Curated annotation (Swiss-Prot):
Name the record gives this protein: Maturase K
Organism expressing this protein natively: Pinus thunbergii
Keyword rRNA-binding: no
Spans traversing the lipid bilayer: none
Keywords attached to this entry: Chloroplast, mRNA processing, Plastid, RNA-binding, tRNA processing
Family per similarity comment: Belongs to the intron maturase 2 family. MatK subfamily.
Location(s), subcellular: Plastid, Chloroplast
The gene coding this protein: matK
Coarse class of the protein's main subcellular location: plastid
Sample GO molecular function, one term: RNA binding
PANTHER family: MATURASE K
GO annotation, biological process: mRNA processing; RNA splicing; tRNA processing
Function: Usually encoded in the trnK tRNA gene intron. Probably assists in splicing its own and other chloroplast group II introns.
Nucleus keyword on record: no
InterPro entries hit by this protein: Domain_X (IPR024937), Maturase_MatK (IPR002866), Maturase_MatK_N (IPR024942)
Amino acid sequence: MDEFHRCGKEDSFWQQCFLYPLFFQEDLYAISHDHYLDVSSSSRPMEHLSSNDQLSFLTVKRLIGQIRQQNHSIVLFVNCDPNPLADRKKSFYSESVLEALTLVLEVPFSIWSKSSVEGMNECKSFRSIHSIFPFLEDKFPHSNSILDARIPYSIHPEILVRTFRRWIRDAPSLHPLRSVLYDYRNSPENLQRSIIVVPRVNTRFFLFLLNYYVCECESILFSRLKRSSHSRSLSHGSFPQRTHFHRKIKHIIIFSRRNSLKSIWSLKDPKIHYVRYGERPIIAIKGADLLVKKCRYYLLIFRQFYFHLWSEPYRVCSHQLSKNCSSSPGYFLRVRMNPLLVRTKTLDELFIPVLITNEMDPIVPIVPIIGLLATEKFCDISGRPISKLSWTSLTDDDILDRFDQIWRNLFHYYSGSFDRDGLYRIKYILLLSCAKTLACKHKSTIRVVRKELGPELFKKSFSKEREFDSLPFSSKAAARSQRERIWHSDIPQINPLANSWQKIQDLKIENLFDQ
């Protein structure tokens, strides 16, 4: 496999036309066999399989032939198996074939995605998640509207297979993929549905499908815009799911899909900025309201024509940047534009022009966060702290660690805000909720708990906060922290509160469009 991957561009034609013979390589199934045993909950699937470390290659060959003739009783996924003890051996070999299928498809996909990235000489930037906040401060003040264009979460299996045919010419290699997708679609839990692409089950196969699906959406979208553009300065590209990036697009002219000679709408030097985290892209636009509506309409039409699916209107929503909250990444950050007067003068002091510009002034959305904490039973709707009853069965250390993690993530994210009063109010709510939870567990009072624990409450968070405020940026670090924004980029994972807040906002948007 390494040699096959190392060939790269030299044997790209051979890689596209002769993938199917790889399914009958014994080394491939040895790799998938070892990987399956590593991720399996048990060290050995069955006793009769433990006598031999290698797979039965004849059994694998028979299974490949049976996949296309299987009925719904043969389940390819362990977590969907209604009777895992009876069909464990069959499920084990099915998982091995699924792992092998993923390995075969990952090789040409990685080569294709890498070549597409290397071919973009005009790509303006390529950044990680830690550049989200500098991106907001650098780009958002020059925009007045944003589009929250969520990637569609489902697609028909046949449409997904046809997208693979665009860059894989070996049709027989896609037959196992088609069979796996249809088998998963026809499972009892997904009956009469399209295959769910979002990796709700954390398997390598579904992560690969998500990476490919997102890459395909973005590559087709940007390549379509480039072909329709009169300028060659258009930046476009496609990257895997683990990569976070943003683009700057200039001089876009979009034409009709059916008649390329007829222009739908034309843009003269627009400013469009694109950033994506997970499945939630954000497009910042500087222009009139008509421009924003046309961009939103184009995204809906693009998904309908290229992926043959009806995208709900609420999945592409637009709003003014200065009046609403924006999500990035997983949290909601409210932005306020403040005009600044910048005076400049020449050396000869001939004139002193006055420039009016905007700056991003992020503030803590205290009301939405309190509403989210009330939904998660940390406080009531008015912000009064209450005990978290569902955590009373945990140990004291686990309770302290959970509250500490919530506060640490919130503090690190909103540490760049000028307004700290709302942030400290959130700390007060979490502090008393933690004390009430411990008091409810030990059937005591808050005063007794605070007297016994003392500085143990949020000990890690307080130490982090002191360390953050005393960073040696200058001799006047304490004074500067009150005037300037310092983003503390230490977000190892998205807080569960952010995911819950995201779901609440999605439901509100869906209900708004239903009305």
